[in-house]
């Protein structure tokens, strides 16, 4: 009998990644990926507006001095928290990231690592799949509480308490 680890099963079972599936990462590995990146980018979705999630997200952004894209209606919440961000739809930013000649949010060149948090699962999955197949110049990392099989690296499925501990470890050095 085959036993599957429920921490690395896609949160929505219909999301089949194919032969290339995300690597399961710890907060320490995620932190190392961000530090190693030359031009990382944080994409913040509407699920990050929840106060506890927003607080952790803001601390991570400040800790790593990340340029930020606010998707959906997160722009206002980030602005009120003192975070500068560029408003883009998730589809729009995905299309920009696929273009190797795009100069990035700060005009310093294309991003080499994109970190996602708080994006709605089904749309994030499609964006991650698109980047996986059509943007080989970019690595993707999801620090959501659900495993995203189409990312290059992802946190496992977990409850809020464990997720908040994971996020806290990323900026509590």
UniProtKB/Swiss-Prot annotation:
Pfam families: CO_dh
SUPFAM superfamilies, sorted: DHS-like NAD/FAD-binding domain (SSF52467)
Associated pathway: One-carbon metabolism; methanogenesis from acetate
Domain of life: Archaea
InterPro entries to which the protein is assigned, alphabetical: CdhB, DHS-like_NAD/FAD-binding_dom
BP GO terms, sorted: methanogenesis, from acetate
Function of the molecule: Part of a complex that catalyzes the reversible cleavage of acetyl-CoA, allowing growth on acetate as sole source of carbon and energy. The alpha-epsilon subcomponent functions as a carbon monoxide dehydrogenase. The precise role of the epsilon subunit is unclear; it may have a stabilizing role within the alpha(2)epsilon(2) component and/or be involved in electron transfer to FAD during a potential FAD-mediated CO oxidation.
HAMAP family in the record: CdhB
Family: Belongs to the CdhB family.
Subunit architecture: Heterotetramer of two alpha and two epsilon subunits. The ACDS complex is made up of alpha, epsilon, beta, gamma and delta subunits with a probable stoichiometry of (alpha(2)epsilon(2))(4)-beta(8)-(gamma(1)delta(1))(8).
Name of the molecule in the record: Acetyl-CoA decarbonylase/synthase complex subunit epsilon
Organism from which the protein derives: Methanothermobacter thermautotrophicus (strain ATCC 29096 / DSM 1053 / JCM 10044 / NBRC 100330 / Delta H)
Lineage per the UniProt record: Archaea, Methanobacteriati, Methanobacteriota, Methanomada group, Methanobacteria
């Amino acid at each position: 009998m085959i036993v599957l680890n429920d921490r690395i099963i896609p949160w929505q079972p219909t999301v089949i990644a194919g032969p290339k599936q995300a690597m399961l990462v710890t907060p320490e590995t995620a932190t190392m990926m961000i530090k190693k990146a030359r031009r990382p980018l944080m994409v913040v979705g509407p699920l990050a507006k929840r106060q506890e999630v927003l607080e952790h997200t803001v601390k991570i952004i400040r800790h790593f001095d990340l340029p930020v894209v606010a998707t959906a209606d997160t722009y206002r919440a980030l602005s009120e928290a003192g975070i500068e961000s560029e408003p883009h739809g998730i589809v729009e930013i995905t299309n920009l990231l696929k273009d190797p000649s795009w100069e990035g949010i700060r005009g310093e060149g294309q991003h080499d690592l994109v970190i996602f948090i708080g994006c709605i699962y089904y749309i994030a999955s499609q964006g991650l799949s698109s980047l996986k197949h059509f943007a080989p110049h970019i690595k993707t990392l999801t620090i959501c509480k659900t495993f995203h099989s189409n990312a290059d690296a992802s946190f496992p499925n977990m409850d809020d308490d464990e997720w908040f501990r994971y996020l806290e470890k990323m900026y509590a050095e």
